[in-house]
Amino acid sequence: MTTQPFLGRRGFLLGGAAVGAGALLTACTSNTPATQDAPVGGAGNNAQPGKPITIGFSAPAADHGWIAAITKNARAQAQKFSEVTFNATEGTNDVNQQISQVETLINAKVNVLVILPFDGKALTAVGQQAMDAGIPVINLDRVFDTPLAYRTWIGGDNYRMGVNAGSYIAKQLKAKNVANPIIGEVAGIDSLPLTQERSKGFTDALAKAGYKVGPRVSAQFTPESGEQQTANLLQSATKLDALWNHDDDQGVGVNAAIENAKRSEFLMVGGAGSKNMMTLIKNDSSPIKATVLYSPSMASTAVALARLLGQGTGIGEFAEHDIPAEITTYSAVVTKENVDQYADVGFDS
């Protein structure tokens, strides 16, 4: 498999339509011929090479550790399959540019599309355009407005993420017989549905245990905002028993604020599953005792599913002949006891 380098954004803008579809794409191209057609339905070994296919991929700019891992994982998964050509657009947070890039993939007649939209609502129409053109779409994480825009959705469970964080904290506090605990929360961007779902799950789990959320701030999924908002929370809350931070990328700043404030009287739970948080959990020398997964490994699964869709193949061990319409990943709680088990899905933040 050979890889052509990405064309920069400036190159795309200057090249214009004359450059055509190739200006938007980078291809990992296999020169190995297919050895057999993949079987139809659920039977057979999915690891065996099937017919050659091209998978188009589009995601936002890799300006966040989690998003960077999404693209990295997708590419790495595609490289495992000798018969797969992987055409990826340059990541962008410009909705109109992402739409244009997906349209180029459609015009290039890729066999399957994997799309993590910067804005699910805004890219719904182009997802449906692909489906109408006979190109199945794997909608990754940020969901389109209608199932008509995708063949299969795969993503995380934001509500369950909050539930599992709250349940873990409640269990730890009850084991220590902490009465009337003060439980803080460093949320992500409050206007986003995903943040609202995470917070609701957290609140519901604590309420089930007879607890409630105390001091709460919202950050922007960045280390800088995490540090600033956590510093504000710690200044207003002179005592804490537990703290949940929604996102391990902003958790870099959250941890810095905790260290700067020289606070260690509480336990902290992170969110998503970054490598550095897993290292802190394993070392067990800071307030960080767990993180709740929202793993970018879902991108690897999305590409594997795209390959099967393109080859008309089901999942080998499943009784059903077709790829499921929806797959929701599980938000496992990573602790000192099981961190080695999950180290392979940790991402750089």
Stretches found by the model and what they are:
Residues D37-I53, V186-D190, L194, Y294, ...:
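Hinge/cleft segment of the Venus flytrap/periplasmic-binding protein
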Residues I115-D132, F202, A219-T279:
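Hydrophobic alpha-helical
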Residues C28-D37:
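Bacterial lipoprotein signal-peptidase II cleavage site
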Residues M1-L7, G15-A27:
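N-terminal secretory signal peptides
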Residues K121-R160, A179-I182, K275-P287:
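Flexible loop/hinge segments that line or gate small-molecule binding clefts
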Residues G44-N73, Q77, F81, F86-Q101, ...:
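Extracytoplasmic "Venus flytrap"
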Residues Q98, I154-N180, S225-E227, G273-M278, ...:
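Hydrophobic alpha-helical segments within soluble ligand-binding/sensing domains
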Residues W66-Q79, M161-Y168, P193-Y211, Q229, ...:
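Short, solvent-exposed amphipathic alpha-helices that sit
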